[in-house]
Amino acid sequence: MKKLLFILIFCINLLAEERVVTLSPSINEIVFALGMGNNVVANTKHCDFPEESKAVPKIGGYNDISLEKVLESKPTVVIGQDYDEKLNQNLNALGIKTLIYKTNTISSIKNTILDLGTYFKKEEKAKEFVANIDNALSSIGSIVENKKVLIVISPKKSLSNQIYVTGNFLYFEDIIKASGNQNAYFSTNPAQPVVNTEKIIAMNPDVIVLLTPFLDGKYEEQQEIINVWKQLPINASKENNIYTVDKLYAGIPSQRVEFFIKDFKKILENVRNK
């Protein structure tokens, strides 16, 4: 087995053309957006944007990346994120070039775009994406201020004791702050927040944004979920400030965060105009 691995690595080094493996949806989107999609030789089963990335050979998911399949794709570079330390160590041990990034904040998303732009010699395109993000952020200030905003991840059609919300250590926090408002949820714990209805009532958010990419275009079903949340005795339901964002990009920290910021701007304008 070891002999086979070293033969594969030797073959990789003989290749002149860049052969890229992307290990997360956000990295995959950025690489494609920079115009390097034709060089992506493998990605994960969660990398489904842009459309052509669905046809790229798959090497597993978040928790089951196949090291053997990565090697079989003969990459010149593997680009991933910092949440699979063991895989990253194994790749380094085998002499595979790896680029590892964080994309949890707006700053880290922009840095990732710029760094990959430099790596692929696509600096101008990368700067354009970063400028678009900055311009979108600048546009959301002072529309409404001092509101408590709660962003809910993949809400169900009934309220439960396991409601996933965005905490204070993700890019959503940066977006809310840039708008002059605050996250209704607060904790110094960086772990993924899971709350129940009692905690939401105690938070008493003024605005609720429900991320529903699984219901893209299914407006009746989205309204059903909104109606469930309207039953809660909170400001957001009393003031009819419960909204959905049904696009996949809302949960992917890539250059397309620009589009979520623009969606959030429309929500804030709707709140203001009531």
Positions of PLM-derived features:
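His/Asp/Glu-enriched short active-site or ligand-binding loop at hydrolase and phosphoryl-transfer sites
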Residues: T44, T166-Q192, T212, T244
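Flexible loop/hinge segments that line or gate small-molecule binding clefts
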Residues: F49, Y83, L87-Y119
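Structured C-terminal subdomain patch of bacterial secreted/periplasmic proteins
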Residues: E18-R19, I65, K110-T118, K125-N132, ...
